């Protein structure tokens, strides 16, 4: 163990050092233990290992004696006696000897306890076994043993494996594992071995060769169950439902540090921490009480930097406060990220509040907010990968220089601006408003998730010290909101820790009474960039104002004379001098009614240096004015110091000696007492004493610095439940504090919201594992030892004064009577919210977990002990219940009631619920049923124990109790009576925001305060999970996860252009290759559809060879639809439901060409020939290759696969049945046009019929009705329904009788886990376009509810790799249209662009013939000329006069886009055309964050191909739009093409001639 490296086992009772190895011999007690040697003491000497029989081991008075027999000469036992002390072995022997000796001591003690139990003695002995290794292909068990070699062992027992080494510097390992016997194959392969370890990671960790000696010993599970295990996830989105299954899977198993654990072989996590009793160990056993915490190495981090007046202040070293952020704080965090290898995505926002009033904020009373303020938020960095950290730092510096100028300059007119307003102090800043803005990112759990990042974490950086004035109503609203969200909040203070409790919020209630409280949902840290830790409080003084007013040392040298300080020769340091000075300053005065302390307590205080110093600094006296003879604590005036500015806060020291209430005293007498004690205050802002001869100089200095300030006597204000309330607390370094001299006496404080004792001895000890103190030091204590967080003295003496009052808000905040008094251990344990308490290991100081919050933030734990008492549960909650039964149709997918119950819990965890465990839950369950003992409450279920168990889940004010009886699941919802009037009556909060590319600040589109998580209809969600989708009345209310993808053209691989098919070399164009790629992706979607068990067993497997057809077109969409108008009018004709023909109707390859040609044209299921337009060419009476392949499979009994159909089709083509329209290709399966040769054409008549198979599934246009639904669109997914199929005719706007509904997309239920490796049915709904223009975007939309996100990500990755082979790119884009993004995410950057030329008004381009057909002709041309492709059409496009005869919808719903939306071919940015003709651009952060992987340590060149420079594209486009000459050239080019009739005005696209890579 390195020198000084200790683990603090108890935070608040002191910094008791604990050795890292608790099994060290120093822990052996001095009791005499003696044992005879046994055969198991086999020590490996220099040459061989011999069994000994004459050895005895004796431990007496910390002396270890080893008797060596004659047979042991020359062995490892030779040598002097080893002396034991509490510091360890003084004369160290080999590690093997130490460990074996320890085992001997422990086992000897067990033998002494029970000599008669020989079998138990044998079972607890270490056995030496020979090690082997096995591969994963034989067994996935980490450790396997030959049970016969371990007497008394059985499968499922817990065992310990130890390694011993004699080489210096090597470390022994202690690995725990569950006993698993050799299987038959392993026993045959490892005949001479007794234990085998899985090769690979564990083998590398143990670092042992084969046939090494290891020692195995059985252990008790209950004694070795660990408290907490930390799992780290990276580069994937792991939701809380999968975290729950992780916990279930790890139950009753063992893990070791660095172990990679997996869920369904695709979700990966790494074990990074195992804790037991405050100690981090290498390996441990997990039981039902072990907490599993998930931390993310690829999280979304949000930094909110508060821009206040203090940011421009200077530190002692001359550094500006803000520069600490960019010079030390962020670089240190980035280095931490680099060392860990994180892949975070970060956003940084400046948060400022401008006071527009003329008065100073000092005139505003404590706890009162500034009235005339405007809040501003500047998005500096928006979801940028940390690999760009150098650019991030440059941007931060530039924006900080400009922000004060931007905010304070107010434009009067175009050329005149004035400076107005000021930045207030951090105390008056907008903390709660900033927090509400950050929570807008996580209010909707069903939003479109980033599939590569887990967890959102907000970090607020401030120049203050943790003290804020807040609005009372806003505080209640904010805390209520945070109770239902999964976001964590950290506050980093750049100043030094103050002398009061932090974080501290001040507010005034409705009676204008001042309150102090500390929120539980805000974790605070103090940044210290020096190597010296903050072990003591150092007074500071602001000198900025002194210098600016000319009050320098030169001017005051004649007025100020400093009395020479007489240094005590006995003082060896400044700290000692200060201690001596304080001891002399505070003398103990004895009055006629002096208090007598308990002798034992006094001795305890004097026993330590810390307590002795505290004792000397405290004064116990009797106040002269107290007629009731009540003892008080009085601070004596230092002999050479007068009060400066105002009386200082006097720290409450001996709280149990404080006086009882003075409410019975007259107010005038009480005020007089405070006026008297005010002169005895100590000024804390200086270390120098002013001379007695110059006592008036102080007033001179003050009058110059603060001319309006008069030194007043301290005035106290009485409160209902306390004699004295602090009247002022400022967070600035020069501020002084003030408090009265009397305190309310309360010897035994109890939390008022707890009516019974909550802390037994064990729990009280556990509560010490957390601390409100920062990573450096808390300011609560003036003097403390370096290794102490809270001394025992301060815990005992401060306990009575800081008891919570009636104002305590449960798990939200705790009111503090006197912030200057440290809290006790009981109260401090409540300063971490119950929802997050499981994140922190017990007995581990919180300062050791601070960095992990910044580097690897934790997800909300799965369990919580927060639960109402039985009384509150009965009187404050109302009951609503519903029952759920599984739809019998789900049995076709092998679904059971257990799967339904599992999915119901899964979805609730996704929505933010937590499992409720603890005493209150048990009490409530017992109160419900007198016959139960509460043992049936659980959170881990499996197929054996899920019936008749109670599962409690809670979020905010909603509690669900779920119980499964037989085949029915009963859900009881308990809703707490919540007063929502406060939120409704709260004034609208409208801040100003400026995103990354904006030029001016604008009003925010949403109200952050009133944006909160909505309540869900759980009855509806549960019914959907059960498979009753048809009962849903409003599909829009269904909750699901969604993501949207577009397929864009990309660079085509060189070897793709030529291929050999049927022995013929085919050369394809770029367009044909990309169309073939789309067909392959659609084929992949179709083949992966979910099938019932009956369908899987269907022998007619060639049904799967029939692929859905996607109709490609060029030109105008409605022209394409109009060409099929005749077919639409006759779409009601009866057709055969089955896609297969009867045996009598089938053909074979032996059929002659005449018969085949007739069946093709005139058969019952013929291919209708249609006229097809492709670009500017029109082909008469043709069909496509895909149609013929499907037709051959359907109609030929000896054609079973698509490959067979292509080969046979080529034969027919060679025989002259048909030919390619341009004679460029042979017969190909895809979008290739073919015509029958004239000799086989029996009727030269064009039939307007789509060439597709005759089934309801393949019709292009169909009416939506309950009797005519596509099989592919049916909601056979048990977890989600297809929205379009649930829309009845009443829900959809009914068209006129002659109108026809046109469906432009298909919906398929995709099976994400065909091999059934998952623990649940993994499905999603895939919507894809069935009508597509190759010059536009092809769309794929996914919807799911209970699918594992990693499987969704894997599916997308497979599609992406497939697309790249054909010159395509799969790009994720927002589900919502672009104009709605600022309403959802206020941090998202965008830019509004106004054209330098308005083509509608400019005479050079104003042409009514163009605008009559296409108003945005020039805008579309500009976008497509710049590389943008059409994504979505505006809804008005589908509501034009040309669409009166039909209604267009999609399988995912009706198109509701307000504007036409385009996306750049790189996928990095998107654009919209507004009605005004302006452009709205925004970066596509979903695609950028998905592609930009890597950490800070990676080389920049390795990320060039993944990084999409959206900023460069957007800035270049804006430059073009705002440059008159550049824009004019593009518009002239567009006009010229129009004159030459080379464009289609209705739906123009120039992308076909646009070179992507020039």
UniProtKB/Swiss-Prot annotation:
UniProt keyword annotation of Membrane present: yes
Superkingdom of the organism of origin: Eukaryota
Underlying gene: IML1
Source organism: Kluyveromyces lactis (strain ATCC 8585 / CBS 2359 / DSM 70799 / NBRC 1267 / NRRL Y-1140 / WM37) (Yeast)
GO BP field: intracellular signal transduction; negative regulation of TORC1 signaling; positive regulation of autophagy
Region described as Disordered: 9-31, 71-119, 717-752, 1258-1294
Cell location: Vacuole membrane
Residue spans of biased composition, Low complexity class: 728-741
Protein name as it appears in the record: Vacuolar membrane-associated protein IML1
Domain DEP, chain residue ranges per copy: 1163-1238
Membrane topology: Peripheral membrane protein
Comp. bias (Polar residues): 83-113, 717-727, 1281-1290
């Amino acid at each position: 163990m390195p020198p000084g490296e200790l683990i603090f086992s108890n935070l608040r009772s002191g910094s008791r050092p604990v050795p890292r190895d608790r099994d060290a011999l120093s822990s052996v007690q001095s009791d005499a233990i003696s044992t005879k040697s046994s055969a198991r003491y086999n020590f490996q000497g220099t040459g061989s290992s011999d069994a000994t029989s004459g050895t005895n081991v004796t431990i007496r008075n910390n002396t270890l004696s080893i008797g060596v027999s004659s047979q042991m000469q020359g062995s490892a036992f030779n040598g002097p006696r080893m002396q034991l002390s509490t510091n360890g072995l003084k004369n160290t022997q080999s590690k093997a000897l130490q460990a074996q000796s320890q085992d001997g001591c422990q086992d000897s003690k067990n033998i002494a306890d029970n000599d008669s139990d020989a079998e138990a003695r044998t079972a607890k002995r270490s056995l030496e076994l020979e090690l082997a290794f096995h591969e994963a292909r034989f067994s996935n068990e980490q450790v396997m043993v030959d049970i016969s070699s371990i007497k008394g062992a059985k499968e499922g027992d817990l065992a310990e494996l130890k390694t011993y080494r004699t080489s210096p510097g090597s470390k022994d390992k202690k690995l725990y594992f569950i006993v698993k016997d050799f299987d038959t194959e392993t026993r045959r392969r490892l005949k001479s071995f007794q234990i085998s370890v899985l090769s690979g990671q564990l083998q590398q960790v143990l670092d042992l060769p084969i046939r090494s000696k290891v020692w195995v010993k059985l252990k008790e599970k209950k004694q070795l169950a660990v408290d907490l295990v930390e799992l780290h996830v990276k580069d994937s989105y792991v939701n809380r439902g999968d975290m729950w299954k992780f916990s279930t899977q790890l139950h009753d198993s063992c893990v070791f540090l660095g172990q990679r654990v997996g869920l369904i072989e695709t979700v990966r996590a790494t074990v990074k921490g195992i804790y037991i009793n405050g100690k981090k160990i290498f390996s441990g056993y997990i039981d039902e009480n072990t907490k599993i915490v998930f931390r993310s190495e690829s999280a979304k981090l949000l930094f909110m930097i508060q821009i206040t007046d203090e940011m421009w202040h200077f530190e002692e070293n001359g550094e500006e406060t803000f520069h600490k952020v960019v010079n030390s704080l962020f670089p240190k965090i980035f280095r931490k990220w680099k060392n860990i290898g994180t892949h975070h995505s970060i956003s940084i926002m400046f948060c400022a509040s401008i006071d527009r009033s003329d008065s100073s904020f000092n005139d505003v009373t404590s706890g009162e907010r500034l009235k005339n303020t405007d809040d501003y938020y500047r998005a500096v960095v928006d979801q940028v990968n940390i690999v760009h950290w150098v650019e991030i730092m440059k941007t931060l510096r530039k924006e900080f220089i400009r922000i004060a100028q931007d905010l304070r300059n107010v434009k009067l007119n175009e050329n005149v601006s004035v400076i107005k307003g000021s930045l207030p102090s951090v105390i008056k800043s907008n903390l709660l408003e900033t927090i509400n803005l950050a929570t807008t990112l996580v209010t909707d759990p069903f939003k479109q998730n980033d599939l590569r990042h887990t967890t959102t974490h907000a970090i607020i950086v401030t120049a203050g010290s943790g003290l804020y004035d807040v609005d009372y109503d806003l505080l209640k609203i904010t805390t209520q909101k945070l109770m239902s969200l999964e976001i964590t909040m950290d506050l980093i203070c750049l100043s030094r820790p103050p002398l009061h409790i932090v974080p501290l919020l001040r507010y005034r209630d409705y009676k204008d009474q001042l309150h102090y409280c500390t929120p539980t949902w805000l974790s605070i840290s103090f940044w210290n960039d020096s190597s010296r830790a903050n072990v003591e409080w150092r007074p500071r003084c602001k000198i900025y104002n002194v210098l600016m007013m000319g009050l320098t040392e030169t001017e005051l040298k004649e007025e100020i004379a400093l009395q020479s300080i007489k240094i005590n020769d006995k003082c060896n340091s400044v700290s000692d001098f200060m201690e001596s000075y304080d001891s002399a300053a505070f003398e103990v005065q004895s009055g006629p009614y002096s208090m007598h302390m308990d002798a034992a307590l006094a001795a305890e205080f004097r026993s330590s240096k810390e307590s002795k110093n505290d004792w000397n600094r405290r004064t116990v006296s009797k106040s002269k004015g107290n007629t009731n003879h009540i003892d008080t604590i009085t601070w004596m005036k230092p002999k050479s110091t007068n009060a400066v500015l105002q009386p200082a806060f006097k720290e409450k020291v001996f709280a149990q000696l404080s006086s009882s209430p003075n409410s019975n005293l007259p107010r005038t007498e009480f005020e007089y007492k405070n006026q008297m004690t005010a002169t005895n205050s100590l000024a804390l802002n200086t270390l120098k004493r002013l001379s007695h001869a110059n006592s008036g100089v102080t007033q001179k200095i003050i009058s110059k610095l603060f001319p309006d300030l008069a030194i007043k006597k301290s005035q106290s204000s009485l409160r209902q439940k306390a004699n004295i309330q602090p009247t002022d607390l400022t967070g600035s370094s020069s501020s002084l504090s003030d408090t009265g001299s009397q305190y309310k006496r309360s010897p035994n404080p109890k939390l008022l919201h707890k009516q019974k004792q909550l802390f037994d001895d064990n729990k009280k000890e556990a509560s010490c594992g957390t601390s409100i103190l920062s990573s450096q030091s808390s300011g609560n204590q003036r003097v403390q030892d370096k290794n102490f967080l809270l001394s025992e003295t301060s815990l005992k003496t401060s306990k009575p004064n800081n008891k919570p009052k009636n104002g305590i808000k449960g798990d939200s905040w705790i009111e503090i009577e006197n912030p200057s008094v440290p809290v006790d251990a009981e109260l401090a344990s409540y300063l971490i919210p119950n929802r997050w308490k499981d994140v922190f290991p017990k007995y581990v100081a919180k300062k050791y977990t601070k960095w992990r919050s910044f580097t690897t933030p934790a997800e909300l734990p799965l369990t919580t002990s927060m639960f109402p008492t039985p009384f509150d549960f009965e009187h404050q909650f109302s009951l609503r219940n519903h029952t759920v039964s599984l739809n019998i149709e789900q049995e076709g997918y092998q679904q059971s009631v257990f799967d339904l119950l599992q999915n119901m819990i899964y979805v609730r965890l996704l929505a933010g619920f937590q499992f409720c465990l603890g005493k209150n839950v048990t009490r409530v369950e017992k109160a419900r049923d007198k016959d139960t003992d509460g043992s049936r409450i659980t959170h881990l279920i499996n197929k054996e124990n899920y019936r008749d168990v109670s599962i409690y889940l809670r979020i905010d004010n909603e509690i669900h109790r779920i119980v499964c009886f037989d085949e029915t699941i009963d859900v009881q919802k308990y809703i707490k009576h919540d007063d929502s009037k406060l939120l409704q009556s709260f004034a609208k909060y409208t801040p100003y925001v400026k995103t990354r590319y904006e030029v001016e600040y604008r009003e925010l589109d949403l109200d952050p305060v009133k944006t909160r998580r909505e309540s869900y209809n759980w009855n509806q969600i549960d019914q959907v999970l059960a498979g009753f989708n048809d009962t849903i009345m409003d599909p829009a209310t269904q909750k699901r996860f969604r993501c949207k993808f577009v397929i864009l053209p990309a660079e085509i691989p060189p070897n793709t252009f030529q291929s050999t098919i049927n022995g013929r070399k085919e050369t394809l164009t770029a367009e044909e290759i990309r169309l073939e790629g789309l067909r392959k992706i659609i084929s992949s979607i179709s083949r992966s559809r979910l099938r019932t068990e009956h369908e899987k067993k269907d022998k007619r497997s060639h049904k799967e060879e029939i692929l859905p057809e996607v109709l490609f077109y060029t030109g105008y969409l409605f022209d394409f639809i109009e060409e099929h108008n005749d077919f639409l009018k006759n779409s009601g004709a009866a057709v055969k439901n089955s896609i297969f023909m009867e045996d009598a109707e089938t053909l074979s390859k032996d059929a002659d060409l005449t018969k085949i040609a007739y069946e093709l044209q005139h058969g019952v299921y013929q291919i209708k020939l249609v006229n097809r337009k492709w670009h500017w060419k029109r082909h008469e009476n043709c069909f496509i290759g895909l149609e013929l392949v499907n037709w051959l499979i359907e109609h030929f009994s000896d054609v079973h696969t698509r490959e067979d159909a292509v080969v046979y089709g080529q034969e027919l083509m060679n025989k002259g049945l048909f030919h390619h329209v341009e004679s460029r290709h042979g017969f190909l399966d895809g979008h290739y046009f073919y015509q029958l040769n004239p000799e086989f054409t029996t009727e030269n008549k064009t039939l307007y019929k789509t060439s597709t198979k005759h089934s309801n599934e393949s019709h292009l246009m169909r009416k939506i009705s309950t009797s005519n639904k596509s099989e592919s669109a049916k909601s056979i997914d048990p977890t989600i329904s297809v929205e379009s199929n649930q829309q009845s005719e009443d829900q959809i706007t009914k068209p006129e009788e002659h109108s026809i509904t046109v469906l432009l997309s298909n919906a398929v239920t995709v099976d994400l886990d065909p091999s059934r490796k998952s623990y649940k049915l993994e499905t999603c709904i895939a919507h894809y376009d069935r009508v597509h223009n190759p010059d536009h975007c092809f769309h794929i939309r996914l919807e799911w509810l209970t699918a594992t996100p990693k499987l969704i990500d894997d599916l997308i990755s497979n599609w992406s790799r497939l697309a790249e082979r054909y010159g395509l790119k799969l790009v994720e884009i927002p589900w919502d249209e672009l104009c709605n993004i600022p309403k959802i995410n206020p941090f998202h950057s965008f830019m509004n662009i106004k054209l330098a030329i308005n083509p509608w008004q400019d005479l050079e381009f104003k042409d009514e013939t163009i605008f009559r057909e296409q108003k945005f002709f020039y805008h579309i041309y500009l976008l497509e000329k710049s590389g943008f492709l059409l994504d979505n059409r505006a809804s008005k496009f589908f509501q034009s006069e040309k669409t009166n005869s039909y209604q267009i919808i999609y399988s995912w719903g009706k198109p509701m886009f307000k504007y036409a939306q385009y996306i750049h071919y790189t996928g990095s940015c998107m654009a919209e055309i507004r009605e005004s003709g302006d452009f709205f651009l925004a970066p596509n952060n979903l695609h950028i964050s998905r592609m930009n992987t890597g950490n800070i340590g990676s080389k920049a060149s390795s990320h060039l191909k993944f990084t999409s420079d959206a900023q460069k594209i957007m800035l270049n486009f804006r430059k073009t739009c705002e440059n008159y000459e550049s824009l004019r050239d593009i518009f002239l080019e567009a006009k010229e093409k129009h004159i030459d009739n080379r464009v289609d005005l209705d739906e123009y696209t120039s992308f076909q001639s646009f070179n992507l890579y020039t």
